């Protein structure tokens, strides 16, 4: 017979304190909210990419996330898989005239965005594209209301520019790009500089 342990539940697992249980539940809720917000952010970016393509200004696509099957397909044709390490930026493509563009997209509901939101592999890849002459940046969403295009050199050298490895809402303001419902003009400024005057009309 198993000895009774008041710290464990009927299944034999450690019973969390009410505080720990609530903390875990809140973390799950925040995680779900972040996934929903991130998905909405991606949808807005996709709509923006479609807009630029329709005007013949750029072809920019989301980089597919590579998956590794963990087993054979079942009778329904389904299989389990996991995402493999992602090194490529979230989005990449070509601007009118041939110049390449690559960027990461990061959403936050906080009042600041941290440099560590990019993995080392993602940073290395953006750096490589930047060195080869591509336009590289991080597109930041704050609460899905304010959007910023942070040039890669600024993101990379954040500690040098700001004395720390994060940027506040106020510090991001100089990189803000216009947005309307369902569309982010993340090429604002780049349009006239690289694509010509017709891009700003």
Describe every region a protein language model picked out.
Residues 61, 102-105, 139:
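Short, conserved beta-strand edge motifs with alternating hydrophobic and charged residues
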Residues 108-132:
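Mg2+/Mn2+-dependent nuclease catalytic core
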Residues 127-157:
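Nucleic-acid nuclease catalytic cores
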Residues 24-82:
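Acidic-basic catalytic patches of nuclease active cores, encompassing PD-(D/E)XK
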Residues 1-28, 32, 201:
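Nuclease-adjacent, charged terminal/linker segments that flank catalytic cores
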Residues 89-93, 97-110:
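Conserved catalytic cores of phosphodiester-cleaving nucleases, focusing on short active-site segments
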Residues 72-78, 104-112:
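Short, basic, glycine/proline-bearing loop/turn elements
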Residues 151-201:
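Intrinsically disordered, low-complexity terminal regions enriched in charged/polar residues
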